[in-house]
Amino acid sequence: MKIIHQPADLAIGRGKACLAIGMFDGVHLGHQQVFRQTIEDSHRNEGRSVAVTFDRHPASVIAPDRTPAMLQNRNQRLRAIESLGIDDVLLIEFNTAFSRKPGAEFIRELADGFGMIHSICVGANFTFGHRRDGNVGLLRTLGQALGFHVHGLQAVSLDGQAVSSTRIRAAVRTGDLDAAGQMLGRTFAIEGIVVEGDRHGRELGFPTANLDTNGLALPPNGVYAAHARLGQVTHRAVLNIGLRPTLANPDPSLQVEAHLLDFDADLYGQAMEIELVERLRDEQRFGSTDELATQISRDIERARTLF
């Protein structure tokens, strides 16, 4: 899959670009049907399927105080899109200037840049452009004028409700990871860069990889059995999310740290993806670090029975 930053970077024939447009946070079941339709269009037209998406959530520019916690970081999102068979991604920098662009202007620029579009596929409730002045109706009007087809697909339903990134975030936040996984079509996973911690885990005999998960949706604090993926290699792990109340810290901050079973190496600066297998217990305050170490040993032994 090729990642481009402007339509002209992709040399394809006139009328061969089949576009899916959206933020696609989570690349959930609803997004997946949009991509399937886009890929089907490209195969029928001997064209290219192109996901048009943004480098950051629009709310982070338009209303930073209302930016949602993201289900994926950018690399996760792009990998998920690639896994579905999309040919190319147009990754647009969403900045203040772009946020002020009317929807019709955005679509006309795409059509000009790609040298005419064959089709655009979006969700039925998709909006775009300055002050959300664009919707499926505007796309259909522009499609008639510019010669492209429009698919406005109805949401995928699960248990009688529409699958959406908002609904999945709520499921993650409350710890309903089974529901989140069903809506995502895969196990919920957190990815972050391994950063330097305070080495308390190593002092207890259980070295951990501390992840930078700033801006990501996280499940409730607690201990989880997990799979930790480093590149193409997966390790069994125990994940802790919380404030580590047993450790003396007058100003605790949320930590996301993974102990990889039967593994010990310097991982600083590497990307690690954590798939949550099962919640083991709530976060607890212990009377001593010895009691904490004993409980961690029990957590590890229980986790081993789950893999």
PLM ranges: what are they?
Residues 28, 81, 120, 180, ...:
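Residue-level signal for inorganic ion chemistry
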Residues 2-9, 69, 90:
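Short acidic-hydrophobic, aromatic-tinged amphipathic segments that line or gate anion-handling sites
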Residues 13, 197-307:
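Phosphate/ribose-recognition catalytic cores of enzymes acting on nucleotide-derived substrates
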Residues 143-243:
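Glycine-rich, Lys/Arg-enriched anion-binding loops that position phosphate/diphosphate groups
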Residues 9-73:
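N-terminal catalytic cores of NTP/NDP-binding nucleotidyl/phosphoryl-transfer enzymes
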Residues 60-146:
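N-terminal Rossmann-like or analogous alpha/beta NTP/dinucleotide-binding catalytic cores
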